[in-house]
Every structure is written in C-alpha cells, then in structure tokens.
C-alpha cells in the first residue's frame, strides 16, 4: 500500500519502511523553535531535565515576535530569559530587534525550514511550512523542551484528507478565500488531527506565499498540518534560500486517504469569516450589503503579511483615503518584506491613505499590543482567528478577510467588496 507525503516523512524520520495512521512513532526532527511567549516555559522545563546543552545549535530558532518591541515589563522579562538562554546555548538562529519578523514568515524566507522536513514549533500556526512540502506542527512548551534536548518527538501518525481544487479563480479571490471557504464547508473540527493535503490545478497556479496562507490556517479546521506537494515553484523558492540539503516527497498514487473532497472554484468569490469562528463564512457579495460598520482594519500577520499581501492592499488603497473614524494598521511580517514594500512604494501608498505602519510583530493578531480592540469595536483583519476576545475586549468583533477586502473596507468604513472601490 502506498503512502501520503505526511506518512513518508514520518516513516523516514522514524527510520521505518512504512507507517500507518494510528501508529505511534518516535521521530528525529529537522528543526524546532519557540517564541517569546512559549520559550520561557520551555527553558524552565529544559532546565528541569538536567540537560547541559541543546541537541544542535543550528537546528533551533528563538523568534521574539509576539510582543516585539517589548510592550511591558513582563514581556521584557520573557525576552530577556530567552535571550540569555540563546547566549548560553550558543543558538545560532536568534531573532529580535531589527532582525525579527513574524516567525512563520521569517523562517521560510531565510531557508531554515525546507521541503521534507519534520518540524515542531511551540506555536499553533507552525503548520504554515506544509506549503513547502514539510510535515510541520505546533506543540506545547514541554514538548519543545524535550525536543531541544533530544532532537526527537513522538507522533501518532494522522490520517490524511485530500482537497482538490479545480476551475479558474475570479478577480480578488485568493488563497485566503480558498482556505476560508474550505473551513466554512467542513467546520472548525472538520479535519481534527488529520493532515489536510491541498492539490489540484488551482493550487498549482497559486504562488508559494498564497499556499502558505492556506497551510497556515489548516489548524483552524483542527488539522495536524496542511501540506502541499512540492513543485517547480516550491523548488525555485527554496533553492535560493536553503541553508542545508532537503528531500522532496510526493504522495503515492495508491496512497490511502481518509476522505477526498473536490471543489470547483470557478464561481467562488471573496469570503468574510464572521465572529466568532473561522467557519462562519459569508460571501462578500452578501456581506457588503449588510452595512457592517467597522472601527479598525489590520493588514498583516503570519497569514497575510507577506509582500504579495501588501501589494494586494496597495492596489486597492492607491489614491484612496481611509474612512474617518477608522484605524488602518499595516504590519509587514518581516524586515525583508518591509524593505521590499519601501522600495516598491507600497509604504508611501499606505501612509498617503492614512494608515499606521508598524514594525514586524504579531501584535494585534492576538490582542497583544499595537492595535487592541475596545468593547463594542469591530475589526476586519487578514489574520487567522476571530475567537471571542482574540484581538482585545471580549465584546469586540473580528471579521477575517483577504487583503483586498480588508483594504476596501478601510476605505469605505464598512465591510466592503474591492469592486466597490476599484471601478
């Protein structure tokens, strides 16, 4: 019996000929990482193990991205403990200040996570790297501590659901809409502890960055990871960045899937996920007619803060002004993205429109800082979660959308279609 990409990666990394769903394996890891929120507890657990050194100083990253720049004394202390640990252990890949970016943008951009890798990170959106053909999943700080010490982790081999996207994408429909539509279809528990394998001609046409958006949100359907078979686009992306050798895996033709779901996307349009779950999707044609007034728009995050996302937003915002009483916050997800946005004139477009530009940080996405919502406020956000209180007060509301829709909504002061602005 053939195996899926995910099964092949787990088999190779556990030194087995094959694995089957439900089996428990102990596997060697290619890369592990944590951030300023999850690393301090991992460090504490690491010390409790009595281990004197990490398994490999070049296969661990610490990315201080959630509350950067430090928002208060507590976050400063968390970053300090992570910094001191990195110095003590000689960890090569430590990022803060001018080098830091949102981890799930930064690590692929620097070639630290690669096709065929087995990766764990102490952050739920680690599944982003599945877009490169890696098996990447989030863990807690205790598992991270053990992984830093041993370079290994245990896994229960998940079943795989295959999603096939065919047809032709319409204007302003992006990878964000594909994954939101999918979550709206199967629900937030629709892929619980499954691998979501994305395929089809539409996926082949997507850029690597838009594929990352899709894999990033696999966790919002309960998935273990979201994976895409590497192709020429993938290899072109990683070859100029890769810091080490990598191996490409592809699913066998006779691989067994838990379920196969096929979509024709030809008539799909941008969608908005209403509070308070990503599954509450509404087509923009309907949402735009509901006259939902907003207070804030956030364009950024590990979901939609890459250069292509900023280009989408700038396409709508050029020559426009943000509506009165609306705050538009734009945060490039890495220093490289920020530089590109500057050189391409995107930052100028955002500033002229009336946006606030922030340094690379997770910040507003988790209601951490630099864009926290007050009671009763509504935000349109290009992020991945809209749970109760996600971006601030428990009585605030978050509507998830792609960068085109977010930008149009900022201009009109309500949830709006980009076609209402670009006529």
From Swiss-Prot:
One of its GO terms (molecular function) is metal ion binding. Belongs to the aconitase/IPM isomerase family. LeuC type 2 subfamily. GO terms for biological process: L-leucine biosynthetic process. It is an enzyme of class 4 (lyase). Signal peptide: none annotated. It catalyses: (2R,3S)-3-isopropylmalate = (2S)-2-isopropylmalate. InterPro entries: Acnase/IPM_dHydase_lsu_aba_1/3, Acoase/IPM_deHydtase_lsu_aba, Aconitase_4Fe-4S_BS, Aconitase_4Fe-4S_dom, HAcnase/IPMdehydase_lsu_prok, Homoacnase/IPMdehydase_lsu, IPM_dehydratase_rel_enz, IPMI_cat. It comes from Pyrococcus abyssi (strain GE5 / Orsay). Its EC number is 4.2.1.33. Keywords: 4Fe-4S, Amino-acid biosynthesis, Branched-chain amino acid biosynthesis, Iron, Iron-sulfur, Leucine biosynthesis, Lyase, Metal-binding. This is 3-isopropylmalate dehydratase large subunit 1. Catalyzes the isomerization between 2-isopropylmalate and 3-isopropylmalate, via the formation of 2-isopropylmaleate. It holds the Pfam family Aconitase. [4Fe-4S] cluster binds at residues 302, 362, 365. Heterodimer of LeuC and LeuD. Pathway: Amino-acid biosynthesis; L-leucine biosynthesis; L-leucine from 3-methyl-2-oxobutanoate: step 2/4. SUPFAM superfamilies: Aconitase iron-sulfur domain. Binds 1 [4Fe-4S] cluster per subunit. Its cofactor is [4Fe-4S] cluster.
